[in-house]
């Protein structure tokens, strides 16, 4: 099954997440099919907090991909901001 989920990057105590399309059997930070955005939970000032290609999310969901709980909230936030 294909899922759209967060893949953690960044330094210790400073998380940065890529939003990726990946096989659900792959490790969290392992192999992915496509990178469709990022999420920076500790963005400050003018730093961009969320960038997400909503068209690609819609395309993958149409193909049968499922969203993780956190990504579903982020997609809703991105649609509201756009």
UniProtKB/Swiss-Prot annotation:
Q: Which domain of life is it from?
A: Bacteria
Keyword Magnesium applies: no
In its keyword annotation, does this UniProt entry include Ribosomal protein? yes
Would you tell me the Gene Ontology cellular component terms?
Answer: cytoplasm; small ribosomal subunit
| A GO molecular-function descriptor | structural constituent of ribosome
Identify the keywords attached in UniProt to this record, alphabetized.
Answer: Ribonucleoprotein, Ribosomal protein
In terms of InterPro entries, this protein maps to:
Ribosomal_bS16 (IPR000307), Ribosomal_bS16_CS (IPR020592), Ribosomal_bS16_dom_sf (IPR023803)
Which GO biological process entries does UniProt record here? translation
- Family, per the entry? Belongs to the bacterial ribosomal protein bS16 family.
| PANTHER family per UniProt | 30S RIBOSOMAL PROTEIN S16, SMALL RIBOSOMAL SUBUNIT PROTEIN BS16M
Which protein are we looking at? Answer: Small ribosomal subunit protein bS16
What species does this protein belong to?
A: Glaesserella parasuis serovar 5 (strain SH0165) (Haemophilus parasuis)
Gene that produces this protein: rpsP
